[in-house]
Curated annotation (Swiss-Prot):
It comes from the Eukaryota. The lineage of its organism: Eukaryota, Fungi, Dikarya, Ascomycota, Saccharomycotina. The gene is MBF1. This is Multiprotein-bridging factor 1. It comes from Debaryomyces hansenii (strain ATCC 36239 / CBS 767 / BCRC 21394 / JCM 1990 / NBRC 0083 / IGC 2968) (Yeast). Residues 96-115 bind DNA. Residues 85-139 form the HTH cro/C1-type domain. Residues 49-58 have a biased composition (Polar residues).
């Protein structure tokens, strides 16, 4: 037989004849069970390296809370932080409503922070620090944010 008589097929139809079974991905449990019943080779592999997934530390914290049997109280804001917010706000002659609009929050959020009822939020504390010019995190709470250099 010469080279002129054979036909070379490129593309989708190239498997016709001796192509063998194509590898399938079973998406459901039913498909997986059907493959096992028919005697096909079944391999399960975990997908790694998905790009758009990010671990959520909040979920990890909730898992730890589920593992603990006793009731764990939520973290509340320290009272001296609330007093520092109140003093700095009054020095700048701002009401709670004025301060809230300045940092794009609701007035009751400012009220909760000043009363020490709020759960600390680092982003919101940062906004308050910049608006009032007073440190509210770490040590030296209540001191000016940008102290004058000696």
């Amino acid at each position: 037989m010469s080279d002129w008589d054979s036909v070379t097929i490129i593309g989708q139809k190239a498997r016709i004849g001796g192509g063998g079974p194509r590898q399938n991905v079973a998406k459901t449990q039913a498909e997986l069970n059907a493959a096992r019943r028919s005697g096909n080779v079944v391999g399960t592999e975990k997908k790694y390296g998905s790009t758009n997934t990010k671990s959520n530390p909040e979920g990890q914290r909730l898992t730890k809370l589920d593992a603990v049997d006793d009731v764990v109280p939520t973290k509340k804001l320290d009272m001296n932080v609330g007093k520092a917010i109140q003093q700095a706000r009054q020095e700048k002659k701002l009401t709670q409503k004025d301060l809230a609009t300045k940092i794009n929050e609701k007035p009751n959020v400012i009220n909760d922070y000043e009363a020490g009822r709020a759960v600390p939020n680092q982003q919101l504390l940062g906004k308050l620090e910049r608006a009032l010019g007073v440190k509210l995190r770490g040590k030296n709470i209540g001191e000016p944010l940008f102290a004058k250099k000696k």
